[in-house]
A protein has these predicted regions:
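Alpha-helical cap/lid subdomain in secreted, periplasmic
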Residues: 1-96, 108
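Conserved catalytic region of serine esterases and O-acyltransferases that act on ester linkages
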Residues: 86, 93, 103-151
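Mature-region segments of soluble proteins
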Residues: 99-101
Length: 151
């Protein structure tokens, strides 16, 4: 099991320690909800994103910090476009499109602004169709998960 009960307990323990340290220095912490493995990775589990969602949401709520729903954005993008390549070939790390989706999700979560219409495309590396699709996914997931209206 990728995220065993023991691993989730350790995550909660160390997240709290780091969050407390950040807060003690008059700063705001946030949790970057990671994405699940790609379905071709040997340790992929069909319910992995649900385990990740529950763990990050619980720790975020317990510590009163923002949870940036990058993992849920990956999941929704794969649901809507199963052939999109968000992961690198190793199946664990984000590729170019996954990194772009994560950046749009971080932007929307931190600033409460919609990423739809942002012009940045990594120096022309992301085509218009993918760019618009990923911006829409980030907008939808962020506004739904955080229960916010993005401007």
């Amino acid at each position: 099991e990728t995220l065993s009960k023991k691993n989730r307990k350790e995550f909660a323990y160390y997240a709290k320690r780091h969050i407390d340290s950040v807060k003690e220095n008059d700063s705001e912490a946030a949790l970057y909800m990671t994405h699940a493995y790609a379905d071709y990775y040997p340790r992929y589990e069909p319910n992995q994103i649900e385990i990740i969602r529950k763990a990050y949401t619980k720790v975020g709520n317990e510590n009163g910090v923002l949870v940036i729903p990058v993992g849920l954005a990956f999941d929704l993008a794969y649901q809507k476009r199963p052939n999109i390549k968000l992961h690198d070939d190793d199946g664990t790390h984000p590729g170019l499109l996954g990194t772009y989706l994560a950046a749009c999700t971080v932007f929307a979560s931190i600033y409460d602004l919609s990423p739809i219409g942002m012009k940045y495309d990594y120096f022309g590396s992301i085509d218009e169709s993918d760019k618009h699709f990923l911006q829409e996914i980030a907008h939808e997931v962020t506004s739904t998960y955080l229960n916010k209206t993005l401007k």
